[in-house]
Amino acid sequence: MEIKYLLTVFLVLLIGSDYCQAFLFSLIPHAIGGLISAFKGRRKRDLDGQIDRSRNFRKRDAELEELLSKLPIY
């Protein structure tokens, strides 16, 4: 009976330590890296690139619509 409880506690501690290790070694360094890149202004440059890509996409979409409107309907 005692071994059953001991095994349960051991498994709970093992799972808990695994989650803590994943939190400490993946989430925190990524958060620190994100803050550093935000202070350096890389994030702003990334957003500018996304805006340009969005404009290009809209331009290509409009050109495609124009091309499709000129095609005959069968």
Swiss-Prot record:
Expression across tissues: Expressed by the venom gland.
Query: Keywords in UniProt for this one?
Result: Amidation, Antibiotic, Antimicrobial, Cleavage on pair of basic residues, Cytolysis, Hemolysis, Membrane, Secreted, Signal, Target cell membrane, Target membrane, Transmembrane
Domain of life of the native organism: Eukaryota
Question: Which residues are part of the propeptide segment?
Answer: 46-74
Please tell me the species this chain comes from. Answer: Androctonus amoreuxi (African fattail scorpion)
User: What does the UniProt entry say about where the protein is found?
Assistant: Secreted; Target cell membrane
For this record, the Gene Ontology CC terms, alphabetical, are: extracellular region; membrane; other organism cell membrane
Outline what the protein does. Answer: Has antibacterial activity against the Gram-positive bacteria S.aureus (MIC=20 uM), the Gram-negative bacteria E.coli (MIC=150 uM), and the yeast C.albicans (MIC=64 uM). Causes hemolysis on horse erythrocytes.
Q: Which residues carry this modification: Lysine amide?
A: K40
* Gene Ontology biological-process annotations: defense response to bacterium; killing of cells of another organism
Q: What is the lineage of its organism?
A: Eukaryota, Metazoa, Ecdysozoa, Arthropoda, Chelicerata
Q: What residue stretch is flagged as signal peptide?
A: 1-22
Q: Would the keyword Transmembrane helix turn up in this protein's UniProt record? A: no
> What is the protein name given in its UniProt record?
Antimicrobial peptide 1
In the record, the note on similarity to other proteins reads: Belongs to the non-disulfide-bridged peptide (NDBP) superfamily. Short antimicrobial peptide (group 4) family.
